[in-house]
Amino acid sequence: MRHRVKTKSFHRPKEQREALFVNLAIALIEHGKIETTVQKAKALRPFVEKLVTLAKKETVAARRLLNARLRNNTKAATKLFKEIAPLLKERNGGYTRIYKLDKRRRGDDAQMAIIEFVEHPDKE
């Protein structure tokens, strides 16, 4: 039984929701920051933080698990291991930051946000 286990469904089945988080995480890793809704950014944060914590371990098992979680996207996994994780090595969590934007999405008036890594190699 799933007592007290609550996750946002985003009105999607489980597989679609997991695919959404994987795709958002890959975009965040590749670009350093992405613009999405506040709800998706808040739901994405723990998923990405677990990936970064896993990448900081630098073991073969961690690399294989990370590749499995990112659906064998080796480009994103390599960037996470070689560029992002070393920058966040001294940090114990809190790898991402969420900014709420004043603008809203045109179609449904959803509040937008930017989620980004606190330290990122592509940062200006």
UniProtKB/Swiss-Prot annotation:
The keyword NADP does not apply. The keyword rRNA processing does not apply. Gene3D superfamilies: Ribosomal protein L17. One of its GO terms (biological process) is translation. InterPro entries: Ribosomal_bL17 (IPR000456), Ribosomal_bL17_CS (IPR047859), Ribosomal_bL17_sf (IPR036373). Signal peptide: none annotated. GO terms for molecular function: structural constituent of ribosome. GO terms for cellular component: cytosolic large ribosomal subunit. Pfam families: Ribosomal_L17 (PF01196). It comes from the Bacteria. PROSITE patterns: RIBOSOMAL_L17. Keywords: Ribonucleoprotein, Ribosomal protein. Belongs to the bacterial ribosomal protein bL17 family. Part of the 50S ribosomal subunit. Contacts protein L32. This is Large ribosomal subunit protein bL17. It comes from Persephonella marina (strain DSM 14350 / EX-H1). The lineage of its organism: Bacteria, Pseudomonadati, Aquificota, Aquificia, Aquificales.
